[in-house]
């Protein structure tokens, strides 16, 4: 090989190398997938205070908004100074195990200022200032994976989509009024505070509504703002001045007024009297302009043309003050006469032409009964607080507090920005209340809409919807808690001696802590994390919900809200959403999307400058994107980055257009920016129908982690990113060398980022057989060996469902698409026995069982091995403390933890009394309440945890667990200490070498040179006694010595803290003395009834597991693993599964070829054919691994990885085409049709025609038949109806419903029916008799009255009807008819 060794690079075998089919280069880095959660909460907490103090956001803003708090008399004020967090008491793992909340104590520094008030002048002087830190409860912290640990369970706070604050203009689409007239409305939505609606009614009168109460005319609202009638008219209308001339009136000519108007009468020049345009002519804009150029300044109109106009000002007699006519009056014959009589030669008319300017506000003013500001304020007060008599002060205060008081009304920065944008205002985003000009602006804009100018808003546009992430939700919740606290503080300030108290005495932090606890514990958005597999975790954290407090409800949400909107492109995934009632209300963030500081979702685009596509990336929200022309990521570019086509397909303002290339100013960064994480994991997504893709992305989240995970042959390149960001696979925090590895931990000696304050050792604890929230198994396996060099970010351990750092949700299996004896009818799946024998789809599930010993009234419960009436055989798995051993194989009914509960004293029989008198105290009366394995569960005990209350003596088992834990901690400490020693002494030896010493340990000659032999003569601990003559080096040695001592102390301190925590008792719920948790691992092999699926929405239930020899086989004798129905493909239009099958077939074929070449190399030592094959397979480009630079050893490692099948990546919308698949099939020496001759396993005959065969990636879903199938013999009954309970969890029965009863009636099966409705259900006496009869071996029984009949009678009696049951004949005899006497 011509390559030099310097060029060679190593392959460590710890990552999967994929051949990339994508043609489009990746220009933007994909943001961290859980950044949404982490960034938001970090911004809220701001744990580390930045220099110059914290900015006003998050927690800081909450405290600033509530404090300072003054008492009612103004003599004292409580100010907020700052807050700080202490270290959390327990780390994440400890909180998980002890059922605690992972939280840090919040300490708030408050300042109490007491004033002296001068009674005469009212001036204040500061009398006293006290500052104090006050504990304000615990604040939950987010783990590094973006989750919260609340009471020991992992929870996720889902982000909420809601309508952005701001102003929205809309209409009712003609639905409100029978005439179908479109009624416009505007709504001002604040972040918190009252909503303001301004709307038209069917008569075109404009009304205002506050908080959806009764409507009032908008002019009343404007009057309440301090305007009068003439202000209102002059604000909304222009004036035209009419001057009286001899034959009519003269008005100025304006182009705007006449352009586009059809003339009703001749247009006469006022100066010359000539007609410049005849009646009936339509003036275009150009003609109207020409008239001005010809010198037309004013025109003359007749008196008739004034009729129907409106006066702009009052007509007043200035001497007497008498008002002849009011502003807004309509001019009719009467008014003209008045004008003539009073000699008005010049009047102002409102410029209303009923075409482009309507008289809506003027008409509203005329309808409005309120004349003054006071009337208007009273009217608003009565609407808001009906039944209370208003005074001017209360009405004014109430109106002010509605929209203009920052404590009650907050538009928020977002609301102000949106309002500015929509209405073209320029107001800083610190002004968060409404201003008079805002309200006037909204009314003006609404009137313009009615006049046909402007556009209404689309409320489903993502520019009008924003995301509230964790931080913001938490901020709102905490504000509620603080406001509750504020009231209590004010009251307490008034009731105590303010001079003597400290801030601590005024504050009761319970309301704030309760608000936090309530939010995390019971809010609709705080959800139990879906932890089935790493993908389901990540998806849950990236979820956007429109439901929840302040959001929509399922019932009210219409079709529009749920539908995909053009602005979703690159922001919200159009595919991934649940099926069912939540469809479209719960969405997923797209892969590249991020949320900006205002809460709007942004998507990245490449900038285009001078027609050249650059690699500069900008993030834009939906509003900002609307004005750009955006090309798709797959538009073809030349080598310089210019578009090759003259016309390019692009998006603009929600439309898809073809535009000239020089118009385009942005381009998508990647084809997968359109979809979410789950959808981007589906290869050939572009060949699947959207409905099936939806099912595919949803079902990947339900895949159970298997014992042996295997990455897909056909991936999309997203697998590694998901595994890394989900935290399932462990990546190295910093570079170093592996020092120790075992199954439970990896110890790495750091070689970079060696900060003296940090330890030079990284210990990574692996999770072994831990239970997830969904009872799947979390197990991590190391990938590194001792001595390996590690770079920062390398994957060092695989987790659940990951394989060499790639997400691996299922297995690659050999599939044949063909019907087989009806066993794949209706999507059923036929499996080979090999799948079961080789544990291909075997998963481990961990069940948790918990038992608590409480202090009861009759005495304490006890956990013990000494259980009454239980055979020794049943106790075989218990230790002396009565707790099951680890490793015990348990089955239904086995005792896991022995427990006895005191029983009430029962009266003694004479015999018992005698025995008691002879033998003394009898064994106390206890009953067996041991915890047993539930029916249908077999497994192995993998872990036992024992928790004791403070002060309760620990049993042997608890002590043993404690000893093991302390030994583990000591081992960690010792390993870290030994690495620290090695590092420090190596550095010390390097400093001392070849230096002459002025002092040394005993027996050392002064001035001697120090070399390795000298050092080896003394134990290492004595090396510190050397002192060298070089002062600089000596100072370094002393610094190293100090640092070493500090590190040792810190290590010992950490160890002692942890030991103390282990030895300390546990916090328990009230009444619980001791608690035991037993974890049982259940191994679930695949079996008929389990649900399986591919990644393309192709799901089915296993119908039969066939012996290997009966499965169809290939010419070389390989049997198919799975047989699927070909009819499942055409109607469902998910052709992606067929393409995946072909490509998987090619991957396996190629793997086989590479395997043969590896064998050839091992026999002959000739690596050239292998190198050529791999280099041809994985060409050199920026997406592929540089295999040309691998040395021979690395190449063979890679070839071994590829033996089973070559891994490839076909990114969504940029993947392999049919030609690529054909080429790869031919390269692997396979038929390009992808079909082969199959032979029947039972007869050995070939099937009639060729069959599509290949490798498909199948998942086993978390719908296992073991969890669902269930049978009841005798079990619990409902208390009232005495009918058996329902459901597996309650060990219930099967419901025999109304229609089933009809079926038995139709058969005439009277006795069967009677049995069903009585003894098998709620006939208490009857079922007891049946039981006794069966025990006797008898089969006769008699039914009596069912309990539900008694319930009915009781119900009737409660209504006052006394129903009695008796014999009908007796009843009739008592009611004998009286004789009829004839007269």
Swiss-Prot record:
Reactions listed under catalytic activity: RNA(n) + a ribonucleoside 5'-triphosphate = RNA(n+1) + diphosphate
Pfam families cross-referenced by the UniProt entry: RNA_pol_Rpb2_1 (PF04563), RNA_pol_Rpb2_2 (PF04561), RNA_pol_Rpb2_3 (PF04565), RNA_pol_Rpb2_45 (PF10385), RNA_pol_Rpb2_6 (PF00562), RNA_pol_Rpb2_7 (PF04560)
Annotated GO biological process: DNA-templated transcription
Keywords: DNA-directed RNA polymerase, Nucleotidyltransferase, Transcription, Transferase
EC number: 2.7.7.6
Domain of life: Bacteria
EC class name: transferase
GO cellular component, one term: DNA-directed RNA polymerase complex
GO MF annotation terms: DNA binding; DNA-directed RNA polymerase activity; ribonucleoside binding
Function: DNA-dependent RNA polymerase catalyzes the transcription of DNA into RNA using the four ribonucleoside triphosphates as substrates.
Quaternary assembly: The RNAP catalytic core consists of 2 alpha, 1 beta, 1 beta' and 1 omega subunit. When a sigma factor is associated with the core the holoenzyme is formed, which can initiate transcription.
Sequence similarity: Belongs to the RNA polymerase beta chain family.
PANTHER family xrefs: DNA-DIRECTED RNA POLYMERASE I SUBUNIT 2
Protein name, as recorded: DNA-directed RNA polymerase subunit beta
Gene (name only): rpoB
């Amino acid at each position: 090989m011509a390559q030099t060794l310097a060029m060679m690079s190593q392959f460590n075998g710890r990552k999967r190398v994929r051949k990339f089919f994508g043609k489009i280069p990746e220009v933007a880095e994909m943001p961290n997938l859980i950044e949404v959660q982490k960034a938001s909460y970090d911004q809220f907490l701001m744990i580390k205070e930045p220099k110059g103090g914290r900015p006003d956001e998050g927690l800081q803003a909450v405290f600033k908004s509530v404090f300072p708090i003054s008492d009612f008399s103004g003599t004292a004020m409580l100010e907020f100074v700052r807050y700080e967090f202490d270290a959390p008491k327990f780390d994440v793992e400890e909180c998980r195990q002890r059922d605690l909340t992972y939280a840090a104590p919040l300490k708030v520094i408050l300042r109490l200022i007491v004033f002296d008030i001068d009674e005469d002048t009212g001036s204040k002087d500061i009398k006293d200032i006290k500052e104090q830190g006050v504990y304000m409860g615990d604040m939950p912290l987010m783990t590094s994976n973006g989750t919260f640990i609340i009471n020991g369970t992992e929870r996720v706070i889902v982000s909420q989509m809601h309508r952005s604050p701001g102003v929205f203009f809309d209409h009712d689409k003609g639905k409100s009024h029978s005439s179908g007239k479109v009624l416009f409305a505007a709504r001002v939505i604040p972040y918190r505070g009252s909503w303001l609606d301004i709307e038209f009614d069917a008569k075109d009168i404009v009304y205002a509504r506050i908080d959806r109460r009764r409507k009032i005319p908008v002019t009343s609202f404007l009057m309440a703002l301090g305007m009068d009638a003439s202000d209102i008219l002059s604000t909304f209308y222009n004036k035209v001045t009419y001057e009286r001339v001899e034959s009519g009136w003269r008005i100025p000519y304006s182009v705007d007024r006449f352009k586009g108007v059809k003339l009703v009468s001749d247009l006469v020049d006022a100066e010359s009297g000539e007609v410049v345009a005849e009646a009936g002519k339509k003036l275009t804009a150009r003609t109207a302009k020409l008239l001005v150029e010809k010198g037309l300044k004013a025109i003359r109109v007749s008196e008739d043309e004034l009729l129907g106009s409106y006066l702009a000002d009052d007509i007043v007699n200035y001497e007497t003050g008498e008002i002849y006519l009011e502003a807004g009056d309509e001019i009719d014959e009467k008014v003209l006469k008045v004008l003539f009589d009073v000699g008005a030669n010049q009047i102002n008319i409102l410029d209303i032409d009923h075409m482009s300017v309507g008289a809506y506000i003027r008409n509203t003013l005329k309808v409005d009964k309120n004349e003054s500001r006071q009337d208007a304020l009273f009217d608003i007060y009565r609407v808001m607080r009906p039944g209370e008599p208003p005074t001017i002060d209360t009405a004014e205060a109430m109106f002010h507090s509605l929209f203009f008081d920052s404590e009650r009304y907050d538009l928020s920065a977002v609301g102000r920005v949106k309002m500015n944008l929509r209405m073209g205002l320029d107001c800083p985003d610190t002004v968060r209340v409404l201003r008079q000009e805002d309200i006037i602006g909204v009314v003006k804009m609404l009137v313009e809409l009615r006049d046909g100018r402007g556009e209404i808003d689309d409320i489903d546009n993502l520019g009008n919807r924003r995301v509230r992430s964790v931080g913001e939700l938490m901020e709102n919740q905490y504000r509620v808690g603080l406001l509750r606290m504020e009231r209590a503080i004010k009251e307490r300030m008034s009731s105590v001696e303010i001079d003597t108290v400290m801030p601590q005495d005024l504050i009761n932090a319970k309301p704030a802590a309760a608000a936090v606890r309530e939010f995390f514990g019971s809010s609709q958005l705080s959800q139990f994390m879906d932890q089935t597999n790493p993908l389901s975790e990540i998806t849950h954290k990236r979820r956007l919900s429109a439901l929840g407090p302040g959001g929509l409800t399922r019932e009210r949400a219409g079709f529009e809200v749920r539908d995909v909107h053009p602005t979703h492109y690159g922001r919200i995934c159009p595919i991934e959403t649940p099926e069912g009632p939540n469809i479209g209300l719960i969405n997923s963030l797209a892969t590249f999307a991020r949320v900006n500081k205002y809460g709007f979702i942004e998507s990245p685009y490449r900038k285009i400058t001078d027609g050249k596509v650059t690699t500069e990336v900008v993030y834009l929200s939906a509003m900002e994107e609307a004005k750009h022309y955006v090309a798709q990521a797959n538009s073809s570019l030349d080598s310089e980055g210019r578009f090759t086509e003259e016309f390019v397909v692009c998006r603009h303002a929600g439309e898809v257009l073809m535009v000239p290339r020089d118009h385009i100013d942005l381009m998508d960064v990647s084809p997968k920016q359109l979809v979410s994480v789950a959808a981007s994991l589906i290869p050939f997504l572009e060949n699947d129908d959207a409905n099936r893709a939806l099912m595919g992305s949803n079902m990947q989240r339900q895949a159970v982690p298997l014992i042996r995970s295997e990455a897909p042959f056909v991936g999309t390149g997203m697998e590694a990113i998901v595994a890394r960001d989900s935290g399932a696979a462990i990546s190295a925090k910093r570079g170093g060398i592996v020092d120790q590895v075992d199954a439970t931990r990896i110890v790495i000696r750091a070689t970079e980022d060696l900060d003296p304050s940090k330890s030079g050792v990284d210990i990574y604890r692996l999770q072994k057989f831990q239970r997830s929230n969904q009872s799947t198994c979390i197990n991590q396996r190391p990938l590194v060996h001792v001595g390996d060099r590690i770079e920062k970010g390398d994957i060092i351990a695989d987790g659940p469902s990951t394989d060499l750092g790639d997400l691996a949700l299922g297995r690659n299996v050999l599939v044949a698409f063909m019907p087989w004896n009806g066993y794949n009818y209706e999507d059923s799946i036929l499996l080979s026995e090999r799948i079961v024998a080789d544990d291909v789809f075997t998963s481990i599930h961990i069940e948790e069982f918990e038992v608590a010993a409480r202090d009861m009234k009759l005495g304490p419960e006890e956990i013990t091995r000494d259980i009454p009436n239980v055979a020794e055989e049943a106790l075989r798995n218990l230790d002396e403390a009565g707790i099951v051993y680890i490793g015990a194989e348990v089955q239904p009914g086995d005792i896991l933890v022995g427990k006895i509960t005191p029983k009430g004293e029962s009266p003694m029989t004479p015999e018992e009394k005698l025995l008691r008198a002879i033998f003394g105290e009898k064994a106390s009366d206890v009953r067996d309440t041991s915890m047993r394995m539930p029916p249908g569960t077999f497994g192995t005990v993998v872990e036992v945890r024992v928790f004791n209350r403070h002060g309760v003596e620990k049993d042997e088992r608890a002590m043993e667990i404690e000893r093991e834990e302390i030994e583990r901690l000591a081992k960690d400490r010792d390993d870290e200490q030994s690495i620290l020693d090695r590092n420090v002494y190596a550095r010390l030896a390097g400093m001392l070498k070849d230096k002459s010493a002025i002092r040394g340990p005993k027996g050392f000659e002064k001035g001697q040179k120090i070399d390795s032999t000298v050092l080896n003569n003394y134990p290492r601990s004595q090396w510190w006694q050397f002192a060298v003559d070089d002062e600089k080096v000596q100072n370094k040695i002393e610094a190293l010595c100090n640092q070493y001592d500090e590190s040792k102390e810190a290590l010992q301190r950490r160890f002692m803290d942890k030991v103390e925590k282990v030895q300390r008792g546990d916090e328990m719920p009230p009444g619980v003395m001791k608690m035991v948790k037993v974890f049982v691992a259940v191994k679930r092999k695949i079996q008929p009834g389990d649900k399986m699926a591919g990644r393309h929405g192709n799901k089915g239930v296993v119908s039969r597991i066939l012996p290997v020899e009966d499965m169809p086989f290939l010419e070389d004798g390989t049997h198919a693993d799975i047989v699927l129905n070909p009819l499942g493909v055409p109607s469902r239009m998910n052709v992606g599964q067929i393409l995946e099958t072909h490509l998987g077939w090619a991957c396996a074929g190629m793997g086989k070829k590479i395997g043969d070449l590896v064998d050839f190399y091992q026999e002959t030592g000739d690596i050239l054919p292998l190198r050529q094959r791999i280099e041809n397979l994985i060409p050199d480009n920026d997406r592929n691994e540089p295999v040309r630079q691998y040395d021979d050893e690395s190449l063979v490692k890679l070839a071994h990885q590829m033996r089973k099948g070559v891994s490839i990546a076909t990114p969504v919308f940029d993947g392999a085409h049919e030609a690529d698949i054909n080429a790869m099939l031919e390269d692997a020496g396979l038929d390009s049709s992808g079909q082969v001759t199959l032979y029947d396993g039972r007869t050995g005959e070939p099937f009639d025609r060729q069959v599509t065969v290949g490798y498909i990636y199948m998942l086993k879903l978390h719908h296992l038949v073991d969890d669902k199938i269930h049978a009841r013999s005798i079990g619990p009954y409902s208390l009232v109806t005495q009918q058996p309970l329902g459901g597996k969890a309650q060990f219930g029965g099967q419901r025999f419903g109304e229609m089933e009863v009809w079926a038995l009636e139709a058969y005439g099966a009277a006795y069967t029916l009677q049995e069903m409705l009585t003894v098998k259900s709620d006939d208490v006496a009857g079922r007891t008799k049946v039981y006794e009869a069966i025990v006797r071996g008898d089969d006769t029984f008699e039914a009596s009255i069912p309990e539900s009949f008694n319930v009915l009678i009781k119900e009737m009696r409660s209504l006052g009807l006394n129903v009695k049951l008796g014999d009908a004949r007796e009843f009739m005899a008592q009611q004998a008819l009286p004789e009829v006497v004839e007269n």
